[in-house]
Amino acid sequence: MVSFSSLLLAVSAVSGALAAPGDSTLVELAKRAITSSETGTNNGYYYSFWTNGGGDVEYTNGNGGQYSVKWTNCDNFVAGKGWNPGSAKTVTYSGEWESNSNSYVSLYGWTQNPLVEYYIVDKYGDYDPSTGATELGTVESDGGTYKIYKTTRENAPSIEGTSTFNQYWSVRQSGRVGGTITAQNHFDAWANVGLQLGTHNYMILATEGYKSSGSATITVE
């Protein structure tokens, strides 16, 4: 397979021969639709797009902290922009999201030692992602009430390959797309009910879809 970096070098050589500096060719390449799992940096933000390959999913990096994703009859994907490593930061974002089925918008990330996948969910469709999870309490943050949950995934995909690991959830009870998420409040609340995080890996303002269709455009500030 020809790598994108090799393609970019080839296009750079051609554009240098055919166009003046400042030509928009490379800018448009940077906004290409991504359809298979990929991570990287874009405009100073870390981005992550993971898909298990089912259905049609297109992820596109926009200007600054913006990204868009469209999906039709997907199986499972997670996509977004943020930071690597993550931290107990305050995140402000805005955007639009449309999906009346199994999809959600969240501050999403991973830690290692212990391996934990976490979600601070601001909006979900007609399926509550905490279904079947163990409820441990609530946390008041950023003008809303979030319920705290824990689940365990066995032999599931992770940043360390197929593994067994815990998921921590904060799920906002009055959904919204846009606002501020104070991660420290959730991390503290989780610790208070015995949910310990490890060393931060990446953190993104994510859109996730599971066996659904929809679209989202999100900007991290």
Curated annotation (Swiss-Prot):
State one Pfam family annotation.
Glyco_hydro_11
Q: Which PANTHER family match?
A: ENDO-1,4-BETA-XYLANASE A-RELATED
Q: Which domain of life is it from?
A: Eukaryota
- What is the E.C. number? 3.2.1.8
Q: Which UniProt keywords apply?
A: Carbohydrate metabolism, Glycosidase, Hydrolase, Polysaccharide degradation, Secreted, Signal, Xylan degradation
Listed InterPro entries:
ConA-like_dom_sf, GH11/12, GH11_AS_1, GH11_dom, Glyco_hydro_11
> Its Gene Ontology biological processes?
xylan catabolic process
Q: Where is the GH11 domain?
A: 33-221
Q: Protein name, please? A: Probable endo-1,4-beta-xylanase B
Q: Name one GO cellular component term.
A: extracellular region
* Species whose genome carries this gene: Aspergillus oryzae (strain ATCC 42149 / RIB 40) (Yellow koji mold)
- Active-site residues from the entry: 117, 208
Chemical reaction(s) catalysed: Endohydrolysis of (1->4)-beta-D-xylosidic linkages in xylans
Q: Where in the cell is it found?
A: Secreted
List, in alphabetical order, the Gene Ontology terms for molecular function in this entry: endo-1,4-beta-xylanase activity
Summarizing the function annotation, the protein's role is: Endo-1,4-beta-xylanase involved in the hydrolysis of xylan, a major structural heterogeneous polysaccharide found in plant biomass representing the second most abundant polysaccharide in the biosphere, after cellulose.
Kindly indicate where the leader peptide sits in this chain.
Answer: 1-19
User: Which pathway does the record list?
Assistant: Glycan degradation; xylan degradation
